[in-house]
Swiss-Prot record:
Catalytic activity of the protein: Na(+)(in) = Na(+)(out)
Organism, as annotated: Oryza sativa subsp. indica
Residue spans, topological domain Cytoplasmic: 1-25, 111-207, 301-341, 424-443, 539-554
Induction: By salt stress in roots.
Keywords: Ion transport, Membrane, Sodium, Sodium transport, Stress response, Transmembrane, Transmembrane helix, Transport
Purpose of the protein: Sodium transporter that under salt stress mediates sodium exclusion in the phloem to prevent sodium transfer to young leaf blades and reproductive tissues. Contributes to salt-tolerance in cultivars indica Nona Bokra and Pokkali.
A single Gene Ontology CC term: plasma membrane
MF GO annotations: monoatomic cation transmembrane transporter activity
Name by which UniProt lists this protein: Cation transporter HKT1;5
Location(s) in or outside the cell: Membrane
């Protein structure tokens, strides 16, 4: 018999630990452990796999773990030239980006939420079958494994709400007549309402999970197919990929996964700069940035509405109705309809604002020289869309005017679902008020947290300290603006970087060699470790967005 057989005490102990770990631990710690584990595993596998050729020097361990963390947190901060990785390493980085993407991790959240509801439904069912043959009454207390903890996925942060449940009949329930007698004469608690509620939540959560999984799969398959067809049809774009020794299929799946996860890694050293004269490819890649991030709630609602119309399933309509009323199953990507409309409008306005400023300031710049007006317009739109939060670039950011760079910094700092809402929905107001009244202890800890701006200021100061010698010797490359861009880019999990150029050195160094890496790729060990902390902080920023409330500045 297996040591984990369902009838053994060891299985019960394992089940209890499983429930405590997944349903009792705070989501912050669960997600932090998840990203740390994936990053460490990715580093070990990157180190074990061979580089592209034997002529390519093996990177330092710190650069490999930096790359693994960057892929897992979908930050795309480059410390190793991408073309030095072998095909197997590129596929591994693709897997890391897939596992770290927001949509994929939300599917995992739905899976565990569904498991929680299923366990709750089983725990609240009458146990007639378990005691039917013995004539014995059900036990008066429940086992530790039946104590469930609700793992909610609601904004502004994931909160654990502890709701112990029991199937035992309390003395007060018997006194008030709330108990019932079954056919064997034993008194037990009426569980029909809670069981029905758990069953309904289980059904809708499972359905939503399958919808998001289908959305995830369809977008990736469609994007992969479109890029492969484009590379085959347009010889120039295919020649660029083939000339770099990259398989067209690897390039397609890598780019689609990276763009949809909003990571921003591209398997070429130059990124998308190599394809700025191919607007068709840019237009194929661009929608995946929106589908996987800022407009994901919009297209998710459209997908559910389309499926409801095609299938006629009432459960799909119930999902939309609940979210329209401010309720739902706690899946914070499924926003109410009014908020979704304002989100789409906000995204469009921000993109247009960036497009207008970029065209006004950079239309005749060296980075766009030699391109047609249409290619320039598509390139400007591509940069505007990628500033939130993918980070793929079609020109060197160090050559862009300071005004545009500052605007990009603001865009990188904004959370993906930043929305201008001139009229507050009454259901949202009611929910916020009730939440404030019911979670006083939680709000105290929230107020004690520092605001994101405070944390970023501390990180910038720390990096200025660790890189103080380079700031003094190489002030143009190591300007404070470049450091701010790198830190905010890591926090926003974007990947924009001004890079490093030997030509910008005040004191030319004959041993300096230009590499296709980000600016942080030239930092010291302490600076890289600090930036990795920023990447983790940015990936988990939803837990601290409302920090700093204890400060009163008047």
């Amino acid at each position: 018999m297996s040591s984990l057989d369902a009838t053994t005490p060891r299985y019960d102990e394992f089940k209890r630990i499983y429930h405590l770990f997944l349903f009792h631990a705070h989501p912050f710690w669960l997600q932090l452990l998840y990203f740390l584990f994936i990053s460490l595993l990715g580093f070990l596998m990157l180190k074990a796999l061979p580089m592209k050729t034997s002529m390519v020097p093996r990177p330092m361990d710190l650069d490999l773990i930096f790359t693994s963390v960057s892929a897992t947190t979908v930050s795309s901060m480059v410390a190793v030239e991408m073309e030095s990785f072998s095909n197997s390493q590129l596929l591994l980085i693709t897997l890391l980006m897939l596992l770290g993407g927001e949509v994929f991790t939300s599917i995992l959240g739905l899976y565990f939420t569904n498991a929680k509801y299923s366990s709750k439904m089983i725990a609240t069912l009458p146990d007639d079958d378990d005691h039917g043959g013995s004539g014995k009454p059900p036990p008066a207390t429940t086992s530790p494994s039946s104590t469930l903890v609700e793992l909610e996925l609601a904004p502004p942060m994931d909160v654990v709400v502890v709701n112990p449940t029991t199937t035992a009949t309390t003395h007060d329930e018997v006194e008030l007549g709330l108990g019932r007698r079954n056919k064997r004469g034993c008194t037990c608690t009426t569980t029909h309402t809670s069981s029905s509620s758990s069953a309904s939540k289980t059904t809708t959560t499972r359905l939503l999970m399958f919808v998001v999984m289908g959305y995830h799969a369809v977008v990736h398959v469609a994007g992969y197919t479109a890029i492969v067809v484009y590379l085959s049809a347009v010889g120039g774009a295919g020649a660029v990929v083939a000339g770099k020794g990259i398989s067209a299929h690897t390039f397609a799946i890598f780019t689609v996964v990276s763009t949809f996860a909003n990571c921003g890694f591209v398997p070429t050293n130059e990124g998308m700069v190599s394809f700025r004269s191919f607007p068709g490819l840019l237009l194929l890649v661009m929608p995946h940035v929106l589908l996987g991030n800022t407009l994901f709630p919009v297209f998710l609602r459209l997908a559910i509405a389309a499926l409801e119309r095609v299938t006629g399933w009432p459960e799909l309509g119930e999902l939309l109705i609940r979210r329209r009323r401010g309720g739902g199953e706690g899946y914070h990507h499924l926003l109410p309809s009014s908020r979704t409309r304002f989100l789409a409008l906000t995204v469009a306005v921000l993109v247009v604002a960036q497009l207008a400023l970029f065209c006004a300031m950079e239309w005749g710049s060296d980075g766009l020289r030699g391109l047609t007006a249409g290619q320039k317009l598509v390139g400007a739109l591509f940069m505007a869309v990628n500033s939130r939060h993918s980070g793929e670039m079609v020109l060197d950011l160090s050559t862009v005017s300071s005004a545009v760079v500052v605007l990009y910094v603001v865009m990188m700092y904004l959370p993906p679902y930043t929305t201008f809402v001139p009229v507050q929905d009454k259901h949202q107001q009611t929910g916020a008020q009730s939440g404030q009244e019911g979670s006083s202890s939680s709000s105290i800890w929230q107020k004690l947290l520092m605001s994101p701006l405070s944390c970023l200021a501390i990180f910038i100061v720390v990096i200025c300290i660790t890189e103080r010698r380079q700031i003094a010797d190489d002030p143009i490359n190591y300007s404070v603006l470049n450091i701010v861009v790198e830190v905010i880019s890591a926090y926003g999990n974007v990947g924009f970087s001004t890079g490093y150029s030997c030509a910008r050195q005040v004191r030319p160094d004959g041993s300096c060699r230009d590499l296709w890496v980000g600016f942080s790729g030239k930092w010291s060990k302490q600076g890289k470790l600090t930036l990795m902390a920023v990447m983790f902080y940015g990936r988990l920023k939803k837990f601290s967005l409302h920090g700093g409330q204890a400060w009163k500045i008047e």
